[in-house]
Amino acid sequence: MRYLCKSILLAVHTILLVGSVCCSTDVHNTDDKYALIHVSAHDEQSLHLIKQLQLNDFKYDLDFWKSPSSISDKADIMVKRGKSERMLRQILSFANVTVSMSVPDVEKLIMRNEGTTSKSHLGFGSLSKWLHDDPILDSEPDLDLTKVGALKKAKYPFGDYASYADMVKYMRTIEFYYPRIAKIVRIGATHEGKPIEGLKIGARSSHKKRAVWVDGNIHAREWASSHTALYFINQLVSEYGKDAQITNYVDTLDFYIVPCLNPDGYEYTRTSPIPTVRLWRKNRSPELCRPSLWGGEKCCRGVDLNRNFRFHWAERGSSYEPCSNIYHGEEVFSEPETRAVRNFLATPEMKDRVDAFVTLHSYAQLWIYPYSHEEQNYPEDIGELRKTARKAINRLSRVYGTNYRMGTGADTLSPAAGGSDDWAKSALNVKYVYLIELRPQMELSNGFILHKKELIPTAVETFEGFREVVDAVLTLNNSTSSIGLSSGSNTSRKTISDLQMRKQQYRMRLLASQAAGSTTRSTTTLKTSTTSVSTTSEATSPSKTSRHFDRFTADLNSSTRARPTPPMAPPIMSPSTEFSTTTTEEEDVTGVIRSSSIASRATTYGFFTATKPSAFLDPECRDMRYSCGFWLKNNKQVCEEQQSFMRAQCAYTCKFCTSFIKRH
């Protein structure tokens, strides 16, 4: 098997790399297109091949968004369109690996989900208003900004992607106006001299309190993680003195929340929607060069920070090659960002105080506990970790119905050594350690490009799950824990209307019922993105960085202190429809989307049907898209050809509803 895999890898290497340019260069051809494909193995041999491809991703210009954990489990791979994609498909097909298109043009997905009219929030601005997909047909929006606690002075654009300077300004403003419970902590600086800052939230006490650590954005491209961490900050501060349980949290514990551990990488991903920039994973450490197989040298920069901690470092799930996305660094704690975490948690202020360590990532909807360096390897207190994790995902699901799975990273994804969560458990002996992979679930195609409409719902539900971890810490220390969702939490299920819950449950029931019976067609297929469910269960600044920090501070001070709260946003459930075909390689996926794109928020939406059907008021018989009538008009057979998709999205128009049949 090894010989065959090596032969296949050599063939891929020869085909894909002749004449290619090193993946590390920061000069990109804006005409290049990248696709996201799903691949799944059918035996151990093909699974081994996929994993070997990931370890050698830099050789083949591949970007693994998600690794396969087992046979039939899908991997998500971003690959350059054209020759690279065709040849990779041929090789994988020969190795008995199923390949299917997920996103034909990743850059268009980026612009559709993350484009904004505010250049201060997102570097590449709004270039694709017409690319927006149709919203779900709802009489009222699912997104409720009232779930974001109001702070009189400190404002942050929740529901949008903002700059690192905006994050720091927001935290500093909170410290200024809420000094009794909030204090800025600077744990270190990056390669480029940016400060790594977080917020300590806790009421003053005469004794040393137990602590909870939360971090986000250790991987540059995982934007939703920092937004969620900032929401944690907002809720703990805004609800202090209002919500009895949160007041108890802040009085009893100290929370240390660092929203962005990788500011250099995060800011780099904001500079362009080009996939190789937006999907950058590592930090921005200086270039390292290695001899090239084709002569000369390959020079690449960046280290995967979540492979750089001292826990079975460099053993599995990482690479010695600087050009790899999972490069673990020259040595353990080689990076200023990881040293900053280590050194701060070893200070007298923090040593032996931390009872919970939560690190936020995306994506897959997973609640992960140690250990992740190898399969079926667990800490001694695994029972308590599982019990709390189960409570957390159950509580999370009661908010919007989003289902998470739980397990170790090795058991649910694939083995990966050198992670911060495993290090916190083994080296710091933290009791409750969790890595949370946020929305979307693994089966959906948006991946890291989470639509802005889903940011607040993601944060709201994750905070509810996080509260179970805090309750466990309080119980561990014999303190009064939260009395739960049913007893008055401000973000409890009670804040969600019955209509909203019915809509969420209806969507999930339809999608879940169709998932098991879906089949692959050789004709054009529709692939849909929804929010729904899983089917299962030393911190020193390097020399010559002062000028970078001065420039960063100048940028910070030049912007206004507070940003107004954004207006009511559209519905959170925003499926993205992608068209793909096995016969036409360069098909323009925007053909139908352009015809049915939505207008601006201030515009009244129209229907392709003559009137708004009264049956839409019946949650058992309704269309979920504006475009159902348009699709049927342009293809009379679409209901039969795309039955699974159309049954879920256009039940009324296609006359799939039992209530429709009874009336007619």
UniProtKB/Swiss-Prot annotation:
Residues 160-473 form the Peptidase M14 domain. InterPro entries: M14A-like_propep, M14A_act_pep, Peptidase_M14, ShKT_dom. GO terms for cellular component: cuticular extracellular matrix; cytoplasm; cytoplasmic vesicle; extracellular space. Belongs to the peptidase M14 family. This is Putative carboxypeptidase suro-1. It is an enzyme of class 3 (hydrolase). Substrate binds at H219, A220, R221, E222, R281, N306, R307, S362, Y363. Zn(2+) binds at H219, E222, H361. Residues 24-110 form a propeptide. Changing I110F: In jg43; Abnormal localization of the collagen proteins rol-6 and col-19. It is found in: Cytoplasmic vesicle; Secreted. Residues 512-590 are annotated as: Disordered. Localizes in stripes along the cuticle. Residues 1-23 form the signal peptide. The active site is at E437 (proton donor/acceptor). SUPFAM superfamilies: Protease propeptides/inhibitors, Zn-dependent exopeptidases. One of its GO terms (biological process) is proteolysis. It comes from Caenorhabditis elegans. May play a role in processing or organization of cuticle collagen proteins, including rol-6 and col-19. Residues 621-657 form the ShKT domain. The keyword Flavoprotein does not apply. Its EC number is 3.4.17.-. Residues 564-573 have a biased composition (Pro residues). The gene is suro-1. The ShKT and Thr-rich domains are required for body morphogenesis. Disruption phenotype: RNAi-mediated knockdown results in a slightly shorter and stouter body.
